[in-house]
Structure formats: C-alpha cells, structure tokens
C-alpha cells in the first residue's frame, strides 16, 4: 500500500531530532506570545532555554480544556488576528465553547496530515470520497474535506443528515471511500436495507470512521454489512482536528500518529506519571508545528495505549491503540468502572441483536441501577411473533445478562426493543442517559 510521506518511515533518531527542534520552537512561541503559558512557566521557574531534550517535556505543566475555556475566546492565540484564516469551536454543553484557530500554514499542514490519513485508509488520487461528517464549527467535515482535496480525491461534501439523499448519491456517484461516524454508517446501511438495497452491493471499499469510541465487534458488523475495510481516524479540535492519528487499512493494528507534528504521551490520570509502553492511560499531546494555537501537554481525556514498534505496513511512526473510552464517559456503577464500548462488544456478538442501544442509569434507593435498551433484528422479532415474553427472548435476555455480569461485574436490567425504535444519530450517537445526578432538594434540620 502507498506511503504518503517519507517522514512516516524515518528512523527513530531522525524523528527525535525533528521533534526536539519542533518542541523548542513551540515552547518559545507559546512563552513569548501567550500570557497563559508565559505565566505558567514563570511560576515553575522554567524558560524556553531550559528545554534541551525530549525528556525535558515532562518538566512542563499540563494544559486542560478548562484552561482554554477560561481564556475564551482568543486569549490563547499566539499570533495576531490578521494571520488567522479560520476559527473552529467545540460544543459548549458544559460551559463556553472551546475555540481553536488556524493560520494559513496551519490549514496547509492539517490538509497534508489528513491526506496522509486518507492514504493510510486505502485512498488515492482519483477516488471519489463521500464525506458524511458534519460541516461547520465541528472540525470533522472540513478537516476531511481539505485532506481529500489535497490528496486529489473527488470530494462529495454532503455533510451529515438527510440519509435518503446520502443513499441516492452513494448509488449514483459510486464513491470508493466514505467518511462518517460508525453509528451513522450503520444507520445508512440499515436505511439501505429498508429500501431493498444490499449495502454490500455498493461501490464503497473503504470507510474512515471516528468521532466516537467504537468496538472491534462493531467494526466486524460494519465490514460484514458493507463488504469494505473500516478504519479508525483520531483527532480532537484542541490539538488540530481529525488526522492526528490514523489506522492503516493494511494491518488495522493501531493508529499511526503524525509524529512529525505531535508528541504523544500516556499518563496515569491519577498520579500524572508516564506509564510504560503498552499500558493504558490518558492520552496527552503536544503540537510541534501549530502557529495560531500551539498546545503543550494537552490532556485529552481519552484512554489509550501506545507502541513504538515498527508496523508491518512499513511505517515507523508511533501507534496508539483505538480509544477505549473517555475518562468522563467512564461509568462508575456501584464502584465498578465500565466503558460503554465494553457493553457494546457483547451486544455485537449476538446475532439476534443490532448495535443500536442506550444505557439508562438511575438511582433506586441509594443504589445505582442500570437498564440496557437494545434493539433486536427484524427477522428475530418476527420469530418472537412480536412478543418479548417469548421463550427465545427470555433466553436471550438471561444469556446477555449473565455475560455482562461475568465480564463487567455489574448487574444490568435488559430490555429488548423492537426494530427501529431507538433514536438514530446523524453524528455522534447518544449512548448513555444518566438520571442519577438530579438535584435533590435540601431539607431543613430542626
């Protein structure tokens, strides 16, 4: 399979020399132009001149999302506004949105990184790429768009939503590549079958999927449904956007990090110490080439591991595992830590079910109670004669309940749902509905 840039096969020494030069430049740029970093470094008595090796990165403090929000909207910029050519922002559901900005060089670098990612996924010049990521302040749509054009693909900027139109254009334009969230691609496939279209009969050969955690079992379902190769793309707007890391279609064994643009670390989120290679922890990124908004040791909140072993595809870049989940998405049920993706994998293993589900959390007395709503397949629903009290349904619920109890150590109340009853997503799927945090009125004490 083609390799987009010779940097992807650099030796360790070549990459480390490049990274150290970029780290020194980034620290100096941030120190001189961003008051937040200047004050933070000053408080711990560090200047840019103190950074003389890659190991010195660990002397620098972490950056967190709240730092960006506290400096809303433009106090984290390291360049004048007349050098900024684009502004993106993440959702502000828990406060002000997180604003990120790009210079012309930033946009060019980003396009190059994403072109590299599309190549990793199996794309090449002349392909038609169907981009069903959302366009707008979200970085997904425009990030994939720029990379697709840089590579020389014919880009279909359909964005998310309007599933019927998605299907029409896939049928008519015959794209080789599709980009979307994994849950939305399943939605498209399901809608195709309802129209009598076999998803495996389309022109699609490769899918670039991301923006939400998804299990290996869901990958199997997608690849089986569409008869294509599904690869995982990673990114977040605070660091750059999509393309920070990308799985190669050849091996599907870890996501290749763009080491020439970012330094990745894995830390224990409690002790903040680096963990050994191969161990899971929180993913941390430092940018090396960004001009408008350089970021230093940004704590992503994503749980993953990394390896520096050479991939069988020939690339020597650091690889990260697929994201296991987010620290803030991790469910704590009666003291047990569970990621939604762990529950998803056992749903996908059952042929009677489809991977459309929601996890409902509530309090019953003082105890956490978990209810899993999961849809059955249409053919199984017919076998049940549309009756969830049917012995086959009861057996399925008992089997899944025992598996979840054994594998996740939590008790789950399972409710089977009829086909197409759980709301579909045109972007990131809403998997967890947590009603445990409702405010309880205080009572006066006499």
Residue ranges with predicted function:
Residues 205, 214-310:
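Conserved AMP-binding/adenylate-forming
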Residues 1-6, 63-231, 243-254, 362, ...:
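Active-site phosphate/ATP/adenylate-binding loop shared across adenylate-forming ligases
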């Amino acid at each position: 399979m083609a390799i987009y840039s010779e940097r992807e096969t650099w030796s360790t020494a070549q990459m480390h020399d490049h990274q150290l030069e970029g780290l020194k430049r980034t620290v100096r740029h941030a120190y001189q132009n961003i008051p937040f970093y200047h004050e933070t470094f000053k408080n711990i008595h560090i200047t840019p001149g103190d950074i003389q090796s890659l190991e010195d990165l660990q002397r620098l403090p972490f950056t967190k999302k709240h730092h960006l929000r506290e400096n809303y909207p433009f106090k984290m910029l390291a360049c004048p506004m007349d050098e900024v050519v684009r502004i993106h922002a993440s959702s502000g559901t828990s406060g002000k949105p997180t604003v990120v900005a790009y210079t012309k060089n930033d946009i060019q670098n980003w396009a190059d990184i994403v072109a590299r990612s599309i190549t990793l996924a199996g794309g090449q010049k002349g392909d038609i790429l169907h981009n069903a990521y959302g366009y707008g302040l979200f970085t997904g749509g425009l990030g994939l768009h720029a990379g697709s054009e840089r590579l020389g693909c014919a880009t279909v900027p359909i964005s998310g939503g309007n599933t019927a139109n998605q299907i029409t254009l896939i049928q008519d334009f015959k794209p080789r590549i599709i980009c979307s969230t994994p849950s939305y691609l399943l939605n498209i496939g399901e809608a195709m079958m309802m129209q009598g279209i076999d998803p495996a009969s389309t022109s699609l050969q490769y899918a670039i999927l991301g923006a939400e955690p998804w299990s290996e079992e869901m990958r199997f379902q997608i690849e089986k449904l569409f008869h294509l190769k599904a690869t995982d793309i990673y990114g977040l707007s605070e660091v750059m956007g999509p393309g920070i890391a990308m799985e190669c279609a050849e091996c599907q064994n870890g996501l290749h990090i763009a080491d020439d643009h970012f330094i990745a670390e894995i830390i224990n989120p409690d002790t903040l110490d680096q963990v050994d290679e191969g161990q899971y922890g929180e993913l941390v990124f430092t940018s090396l080439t960004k001009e408008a908004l350089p970021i230093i040791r940004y704590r992503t909140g994503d749980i993953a591991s990394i390896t520096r072993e050479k991939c069988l595809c020939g690339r020597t870049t650091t690889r990260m595992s697929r994201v296991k989940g987010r620290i803030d998405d991790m469910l704590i049920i009666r003291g047990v830590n569970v990621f939604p993706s762990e529950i998803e994998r056992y749903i996908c293993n059952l042929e009677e079910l489809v991977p459309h589900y929601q996890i409902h959390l509530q309090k019953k007395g003082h105890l956490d109670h978990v209810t899993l709503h999961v849809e059955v397949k249409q053919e199984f629903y017919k076998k049940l004669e549309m009756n969830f009290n049917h012995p086959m349904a009861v057996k399925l619920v008992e089997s899944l309940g025992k598996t979840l109890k054994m594998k996740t150590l939590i008790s789950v109340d399972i409710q089977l749902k009829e086909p197409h009853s759980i709301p579909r997503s045109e972007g990131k799927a809403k998997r967890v509905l947590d009603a445990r945090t409702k405010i309880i009125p205080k009572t006066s004490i006499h």
